[in-house]
């Protein structure tokens, strides 16, 4: 049974790792980083539901008896 020649494995693995590293660096360098998102302020209009407009009343506080 012939022996497996492993003399070139080191160079093959090393070149593969270097290639992966370079490709990953190129991919990261072309990535666009967006600025930090900020909340968008917009006018919010509260819409009253029909039951809110129908039953909305302003109650005065109870009058205290005069002393």
Swiss-Prot record:
Localization annotation: Mitochondrion membrane
Residues where N6-acetyllysine is found: 54, 57
InterPro entries reported for this sequence: ATP8_mammal (IPR039017), ATP8_metazoa (IPR001421)
Membrane topology, record value: Single-pass membrane protein
Entry keyword set: Acetylation, ATP synthesis, CF(0), Hydrogen ion transport, Ion transport, Membrane, Mitochondrion, Transmembrane, Transmembrane helix, Transport
Modified residues (N6-succinyllysine): 54
Transmembrane parts of this sequence: 8-24
Chief localization: mitochondrion
A cellular component annotation (GO) from this entry: mitochondrial membrane
GO biological process entries: proton motive force-driven ATP synthesis
GO MF terms, alphabetically ordered: proton transmembrane transporter activity
Complex formation: F-type ATPases have 2 components, CF(1) - the catalytic core - and CF(0) - the membrane proton channel. Component of an ATP synthase complex composed of ATP5PB, ATP5MC1, ATP5F1E, ATP5PD, ATP5ME, ATP5PF, ATP5MF, MT-ATP6, MT-ATP8, ATP5F1A, ATP5F1B, ATP5F1D, ATP5F1C, ATP5PO, ATP5MG, ATP5MK and ATP5MJ. Interacts with PRICKLE3.
Function: Mitochondrial membrane ATP synthase (F(1)F(0) ATP synthase or Complex V) produces ATP from ADP in the presence of a proton gradient across the membrane which is generated by electron transport complexes of the respiratory chain. F-type ATPases consist of two structural domains, F(1) - containing the extramembraneous catalytic core and F(0) - containing the membrane proton channel, linked together by a central stalk and a peripheral stalk. During catalysis, ATP synthesis in the catalytic domain of F(1) is coupled via a rotary mechanism of the central stalk subunits to proton translocation.
Family: Belongs to the ATPase protein 8 family.
Designated name of the protein: ATP synthase protein 8
Organism: Vicugna pacos (Alpaca)
Phylogenetic classification of the source organism: Eukaryota, Metazoa, Chordata, Craniata, Vertebrata
Gene, per the UniProt record: MT-ATP8
